[in-house]
Amino acid sequence: MMNVYACGGAGVNIAKKIKNGLANIYYIDTSTSNLKDISDRSKVYRVSGMDGAGKDFKVTYENFKDKGYEVLSEFTPSDQLNILLSSTCGGSGGMLSAILATELIRQKKPFVIIGVESFTSSKEMQNTLNLLKTYKGISAKNKANVCVLLENNEDTEKDVRSNRDKADKAALTGVNVFALLTDRTRTEEFDNADLNNFINFDRVTDNEPSATTLVVCNNEKTPQNSNTHIAAMLHITSSRDRDIVGEPPDYLCTCIVTDPEMNDLDYRIDNVIGGIDDRIRYYEKRIAQHNEKKNFKTMKGVDVSDANEDGFVF
């Protein structure tokens, strides 16, 4: 069975909705506010010396940077798959997931990251940008793949709560997809070696280790992006007669779903080199646009030089 490490407020709240029996779920946070209603306290790890991070990555890093081994000694990683679930924009979850990712790499355990993005403030966008760069840094330093499934809570609606719910549901769907892939009672022609090679495609292709994006999509031809390359593809289908559509990847594995309640499945997960870089460029552009507008709107300040030494004006 796979593990889910729910990191930070968003990760914890999404993980509470995971169906019983799909995964071993562990909760890691810097605050008790989201952990109070978890009945099994043996599955909870609270970072000492903190009461939330206030969207400050550095605070979480300083308090947790040496705790990855401790957490994974208490919550033993799965040999099948480990999911790190968090937002990308808060001060706790993203940094917790990055530090745990580093330890999972050290222990040679398979993992993917599921991250929920947010665009509700420039601080959140900057946090996400820094986290994506961190994933690239971790990959480069450890010469290992860091595969990230990003769920985007931005659309044209004005209801921010609705958008967040959609992104949370999409992240939950991602968890369910990987739970299916690790459930041998509902699948055939797919094993741990296939999943490992999909994640660590550098072992079976001529590609170098990289920080990549995972894209869950219907099995259909997708527009080509000159900045990205599909290094590995995982075809999930209920029919042995279906082939992949579009350009072939460097590595392909297929999972046949035998669950009778899933009798018309035909989709895939693309493991995309260059996807993280594309997303980094996107955030850099958005932040630059925000700062440009902010600077344009900044007006000349009001003179209060007549205030007394305590700042009061009479």
Predicted regions and their residues:
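Tubulin/FtsZ superfamily GTPase core signature
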Residues: M1-F314
